[in-house]
Structure formats: structure tokens, C-alpha cells
Amino acid sequence: QAKIGKGSKFGYGGISVVVHHDSVIGENCSIGQLVTIGGGNSKYPGVPTIGNNVRISCGSIVFGGITIGNNVVIGAHTVVNFPLPDNAVVVGNPGRIVRIKESKC
């Protein structure tokens, strides 16, 4: 069963959101509609572990045994199949990191 942290929300009631049953989603995440969080690829077998305060925008796909850091923003219709560090902003298909946000103290 997927583990979903406290305060995490699914846009539009989770319309067309697919979450692999072994995935882990941290606290205070925001998952848009039409998002897939799925299993395996040959380079990163397994399922995603998503950190806290992550925004996954509509139509995005996150898959494989990867770790998405805290405070990450994944833009709309982005495909992510590689690990992301904390505070990354990633967009595109294939996804690419366009910025690392400064952490606030």
C-alpha cells in the first residue's frame, strides 16, 4: 500500500492520478491531475520515493526507483526517471533541471 504523508493533496480529487502501490510520498506534497507515479525502468528498478513539500504538476510522469528530494517542483507534463536533489525545478520531456532554488533559513 502506498504511503502518503500528512498534508499531501491531490488536485481535483485525484482525477486520473496513478500511484504505484509501493510508492512513498512525503508530507505536504501537491499532486496535480493526470499524474503517474509508477514503477521501474532498467536503470532505476523499483518505485519512487518523493520527499516533503514537492509539487508535481498536471500530466507529469515520475517513475523508477528514484528519490525526489524535498522542496522540488516538477513542471506540467514533465517526465522524470532520474533522482532529483532538494530544491530542484525540473521541466520537459525528457525532464531537465533548470534551477536549484536557494534554501530559506
Where are the model-predicted features located?
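Left-handed beta-helix
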Residues: 5-7, 11-12, 20-21, 26-27, ...
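Short beta-strand-to-coil "C-cap" segments at the C-terminal boundary of structured domains/repeats
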Residues: 99-103
